[in-house]
Amino acid sequence: MDKTTFSDAIEQVMLHNWFYAPLQLIYKEFEKYRDKTWLTPDKTIQERVQRDKRFTKIWYWVYALTEYLGKLPQEKAIKTEKDKNERIHSRMQWMLIEIWNMNWYSTYTPDKNWIFENKEIWRLTTIQEIPQFTYKNIIEDSIRFVDVIWFNERWFPAKLIEVENSTDFRAGFLKMNEIQDFRTDFLFIAPEERKTKFETEKNKSAFSNIKDRCKFLTYDFIEKYYENLKEWTKLKNNL
């Protein structure tokens, strides 16, 4: 008989993810440590992280081991304009990961160094390696560098997302052009004032095959979408 409790298994997931984890990752990794034998195991997991004092909620759907709160990574202070831009970029990446996690699908980011709200952003994703959905060289040379990728339930990329705070849009378009034959949408997230630059790049002949699938969204839109989705998810879970 398996003597590992639900809380023990949750604790193991967090210990192997540097002391914290989003709920979606806990669901995914849980069975490495205990079988999901109950009728509604995911609801039981939710109940345990909310009630067991071993765990502390540190963000929406993100929980940490209470005894290790002092060991969580710390954000560096903003001292330069570069630091400010990096903080904005990491905030957007974090929101984009959370949005797809709330939809219970898989998320990926290549960035291992950025921290937001004392959480390493990549540890909020549900996968660390891109599934081999196409030729290896396309993934290794281009796709793995995309800021955020949302995968569907079949492990194909549903959306490729680039956060363009100050960099040229062209690099993002070139990455996305590599998988033009897939049914994937391409999102560019940037300040409103950069939309003209986005449209200019999108309308170049080199990107004619993907231009209709490329969408520009502002930082304000992502923030509002995130907050509304968070509230809707709370209401849905109370039904």
PLM features: residue spans?
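Cationic, amphipathic, low-complexity alpha-helical segments enriched
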Residues: 18, 38, 59-61, 94, ...
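Domain-level recognition of nuclease-like catalytic cores that cleave nucleotide substrates
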Residues: 121-126, 130, 193-239
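Charged low-complexity interaction tracts in eukaryotic proteins
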Residues: 1-6, 31-79
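Catalytic cores of nucleic-acid endonucleases
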Residues: 135-146, 152-220
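Anion (oxyanion) recognition and catalysis
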Residues: 15, 101, 180
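Active-site metal-binding core of divalent-cation-utilizing nuclease and nuclease-like domains
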Residues: 80-85, 101, 109-155, 227-237
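Nuclease catalytic cores
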Residues: 45, 73-110
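Positively charged, polyanion-binding regions of nucleic-acid-associated proteins
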Residues: 1-24, 29, 33
